[in-house]
Amino acid sequence: MPESTIPALLGRYRPQHVIGRGGEASIFKATDELLGREVAIKLYRSGGEEEMAQYRTEQAALARLSHHGIVSLIDAGIDYTAPKDPRPFLIMELVSGTDLAATLAQRELTVEEIAEVAYDISEALEYVHANGVVHRDIKPSNIMLVSYGTTTFRARARLTDFGIASGIRNAPATPEDGKTTGTAAYLSPEQALRRPATPASDIYSLGLVLLECFTRSVAYPGDAVESAMARLDHEPPVPGDLPGEWTRILHAMTASDPAARPTAKQLTPAFREAVIAAAGLQPKA
């Protein structure tokens, strides 16, 4: 069905225009006609088996998670306008800003901004992991830098896209035969080996994201196979001249052994101190 002919979903959410596209879904800016507010619609392109599995996984994950570091789920359903091609959708809060990938393509981040991203996402992952969920696809394009439209509040990093999360009822704990979970450039070594992802896998991926924030280059470039296999051969090159404790922290986050990586609970206070140090402030007594 042409996107321009999509009706109001659930009788109240009317799509306006596309604001993003992914491999399985399009994101629309839309109007909640009942409450008179703007929302986002994630509309899957088909109701095939793979799309339905991702829809169910993301719906279940977001329904049980409520945190300021995660883009919130409002509603969900299936569009039966074309009976032979039903399409699942998620109604989510509409956030103003850009994703981290687009920001890195445009400009260099300050150390303070990197520390803020690290703190925000680590805090979100601390909550996610405490609830038994593993994201499995931490990457710059899944981190939104949300603007509040005022100079009083800084942009906040928020985590999106739980379509392949694990720890959800009926979501596979291990990859299907011949498949990996996640995006090649940001996979943990255990994901590259098609082993189950754990909270430590998310920490590794976040470490690669933060390293990219400093270097503005992908640690493991190349095609999917080349990129995935490179991390089994060597750990990522972390510059030795990063400010403060950054070199040590990034080495720890990207350790080959999952057991050697810090947890999100351990990282969150460290990143809070990094924000304070970068801002030139002193912690309160």
Regions found by a protein language model. Give the residues of each.
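Protein kinase catalytic-loop region centered on the HRD/HxD motif
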Residues: S122-V133
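Activation segment signature within eukaryotic-like protein kinase domains
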Residues: V117-A118
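Conserved catalytic-loop aspartate of Hanks-type protein kinases
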Residues: D202
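Protein kinase glycine-rich loop
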Residues: P15-G22, I27
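Activation-segment/catalytic-loop signature of the eukaryotic protein kinase fold
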Residues: A76-G77
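Conserved short submotifs of the Hanks-type protein kinase catalytic core
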Residues: P83-D99, T103
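AlphaC helix of the eukaryotic protein kinase fold
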Residues: R45-R64
